[in-house]
């Protein structure tokens, strides 16, 4: 439909189609005032598919009425502008800048106009763009039609019905509608400039970038100078970002008229400088950090990084406050008065609790190759802990502070009785140190049920001493020692292994008589089975493991494991099978011979 109408127009004229909905009376008035030519889409052609041939955006039918196509002559656009400014009372005192600041209440501010240039093919049908307009249908980009007779660029815009009808605007809807149509068209064409007809057709963009939405927005034609970035401010910000860089040296001193930024530019950063190992003075050990930092502070040519000294905490660690140093430590000068008090208490405790015979003098020091572990002080805690502190039970110590012997409950469990019996047999130097459990309010009611868990805390040297004592006793009492009892068990102690009952009277305890009878009946039906079982001890046709599973009871078969040498004598059964097999063969042979003899005699 549009192609047929456009062939009647001049080739030099470019058209812009505008789709909207309205009544026929308003469209006739707009035609007289703005020199617009309206054509009813449904009346132009009888076929209902006329809208599919439009090059503009196809809109769905709304409640406002039927759609119309509006053709605007670009050459007469200036005349329309002049007529509108002279006739409309709202646009008498406004200049061209009025159209830059024009705002329509029916057009949302986020809508943009993209002046796109598309090409109309010579085909009859053009693919549609189905757009569903809202109640306030905003200005939308359309496909500009490139006529076959004209290669000039056409302007295609879609104007909403509310813009042309002016239903939501106060005052005369026709007069205000005219000014809004002209202002919207002018603002959409402002980006293209007024020299389009002079300079000819502008180059058609190959692709539409997303940045065009901001550049060609409907109300963003006034660019402020504040939006442009300040170059000097950007340079200053980039310099501030690199303010944390350590600078080694400057090429020149700061003058009176020079700024601080100019002096910073003369510095050379560490990253770009050549790496010199001896200037950094990296200490080899952690203990030499303090000495190296002190040397760097006094050296005249030290780098700028040495100004920041590594802060080492002078106060002792938290765990050092609760640890008592051992008597071998050399921290008498640096320790606090509390450490001296704890050290004296530890010496008193060690002197009282380490009274041993001359044979155990080696236990005074720590074991060779192992560090000494200091003893913990009493740590402050809840009130229930202070009532029953952790006690350490020693062999000969009767009174010690803060440690004392733990005597246990009044009703000891069987486990404690056994431990007491074992402790009596131990030598005097082998008395174990037992840690008592901490009492609590929740566990006081269950003390009778729970047994006391005693864990001996023996040192490595004590264990070594016990081994040496045992060796000495073994040398003196070698005749009374049962060597067989000390040997580790190298066999599985089950009933099926130690089953010497087969050689004794307990035959029924090992073998199953029912299974033996069933096997013999099967072998009597098939006589070769007797020889297979009897002679398979060497040829391994029937192994001992399979034969035991056939003959033994269920209790013995449950513990049988393949791959072991079982202490079960099965030769009697194999010999019995050979005897029965030979007897059966003799009986069969005799029967056959008797049969032949009877037959011969009858003949």
Swiss-Prot record:
Keywords assigned: Cell cycle, Cell membrane, Glycoprotein, Membrane, Transmembrane, Transmembrane helix
Q: Does the keyword Membrane apply?
A: yes
Membrane topology (Cytoplasmic) = 537-577
In what ranges is there compositional bias, type Acidic residues? 1-10
Q: Name one GO cellular component term.
A: plasma membrane
Q: How does it sit in the membrane?
A: Multi-pass membrane protein
Coiled-coil stretches, from where to where?
Answer: none
Q: Where is composition skewed (Low complexity) in this entry?
A: 11-25, 84-95, 325-335
Where in the cell is the protein located?
Cell membrane; Bud tip
Question: What is a biological process (GO) this protein takes part in?
Answer: pseudohyphal growth
Q: Where is the composition biased (Polar residues)?
A: 96-115, 439-452
Bias kind Basic and acidic residues: ranges: 336-350, 463-479
Tell me where the transmembrane regions lie.
516-536, 578-598
Is Cell division included in the keywords of this UniProt record?
A: no
Which stretches of sequence are listed as region Disordered?
1-25, 83-150, 190-212, 286-479
**Where are the annotated glycans?**
92, 110, 211, 240, 271, 333, 396, 423
Report what the Swiss-Prot or TrEMBL entry states about this protein's PTMs.
Answer: N- and O-glycosylated.
User: Which stretches face the Extracellular side?
Assistant: 1-515, 599-603
| Description of how the protein assembles with itself and partners | Interacts with RAX1 RAX2 at the proximal or distal pole in unbudded cells.
**General function of this protein:** Involved in positioning the distal bud pole signal.
Q: Which family does it belong to?
A: Belongs to the BUD8/9 family.
Official protein name in the record: Bud site selection protein 8
Q: Which organism is it from?
A: Saccharomyces cerevisiae (strain ATCC 204508 / S288c) (Baker's yeast)
């Amino acid at each position: 439909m549009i192609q047929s109408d456009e062939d009647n127009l001049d080739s030099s004229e470019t058209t812009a189609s505008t789709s909207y909905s309205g009544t026929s009376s308003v469209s006739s008035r707009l035609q007289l005032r703005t020199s617009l030519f309206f054509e009813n889409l449904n009346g132009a052609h009888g076929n209902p598919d006329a809208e599919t041939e439009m090059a503009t955006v196809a809109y769905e039918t709304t409640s406002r009425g039927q759609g119309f196509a509006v053709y605007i002559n670009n050459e007469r656009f200036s005349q329309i502008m002049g007529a509108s400014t002279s006739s409309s009372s709202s646009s008498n005192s406004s200049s061209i800048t009025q159209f830059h600041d024009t705002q329509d209440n029916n057009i949302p501010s986020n809508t943009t106009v993209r002046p796109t240039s598309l090409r109309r093919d010579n085909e009859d049908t053009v693919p549609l763009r189905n757009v569903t307009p809202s109640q306030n249908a905003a200005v939308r980009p359309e496909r500009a039609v490139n006529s076959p007779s004209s290669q000039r660029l056409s302007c295609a815009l879609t104007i909403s019905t509310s813009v042309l009808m002016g239903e939501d605007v106060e005052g005369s809807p026709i007069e205000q509608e005219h000014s809004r149509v002209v202002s919207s068209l002018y603002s959409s064409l402002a980006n293209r400039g007024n020299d389009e007809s002079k300079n000819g057709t502008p180059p058609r963009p190959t692709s539409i970038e997303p940045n065009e939405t901001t550049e060609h927005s409907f109300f963003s034609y006034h660019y402020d100078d504040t939006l442009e970035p300040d170059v000097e401010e950007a340079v200053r910000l980039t310099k501030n970002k690199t303010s944390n860089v350590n600078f080694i040296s400057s090429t020149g001193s700061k003058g009176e008229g020079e700024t601080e930024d100019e002096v910073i530019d003369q510095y050379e950063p560490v990253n770009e400088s050549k790496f010199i190992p001896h200037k950094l003075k990296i200490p080899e050990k952690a203990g030499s950090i303090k000495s190296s930092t002190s040397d760097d502070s006094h050296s005249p040519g030290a780098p700028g990084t040495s100004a920041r000294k590594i802060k080492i905490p002078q106060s002792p660690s938290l765990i050092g406050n609760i640890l008592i140093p051992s008597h071998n430590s050399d921290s008498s000068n640096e320790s606090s008065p509390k450490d001296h008090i704890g050290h004296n208490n530890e010496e008193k405790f060690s002197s009282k609790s380490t009274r041993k015979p001359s044979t155990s003098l080696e236990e005074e020091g720590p074991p060779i190759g192992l560090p000494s572990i200091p003893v913990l002080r009493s740590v402050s805690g809840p009130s229930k802990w202070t009532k029953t502190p952790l006690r350490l039970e020693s062999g000969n110590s009767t009174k010690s502070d803060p440690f004392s012997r733990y005597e246990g409950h009044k009703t000891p469990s069987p486990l404690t009785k056994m431990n007491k019996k074992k402790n009596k047999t131990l030598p005097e130097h082998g008395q174990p140190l037992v840690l008592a459990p901490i009492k609590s309010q929740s566990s006081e009611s269950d003390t009778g049920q729970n047994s006391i868990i005693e864990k001996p805390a023996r040192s490595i040297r004590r264990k070594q001493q016990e081994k040496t004592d045992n060796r000495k006793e073994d040398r003196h009492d070698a005749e009374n020692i049962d060597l067989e009892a000390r040997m580790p068990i190298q066999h599985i102690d089950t009933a099926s292994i130690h089953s010497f009952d087969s050689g004794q009277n307990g035959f029924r305890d090992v073998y199953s008589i029912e299974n033996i009878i069933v096997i013999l009946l099967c072998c009597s039906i098939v006589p070769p089975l007797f020889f297979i079982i009897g002679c398979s001890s060497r040829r391994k046709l029937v192994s001992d493991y399979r034969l035991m599973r056939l003959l033994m009871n269920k209790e013995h078969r449950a513990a049988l494991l393949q791959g072991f040498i079982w202490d079960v004598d099965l030769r009697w059964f194999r010999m019995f099978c050979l005897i029965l097999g030979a007897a059966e063969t003799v009986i069969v042979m005799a029967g056959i011979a008797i049969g032949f003899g009877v037959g011969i005699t009858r003949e």
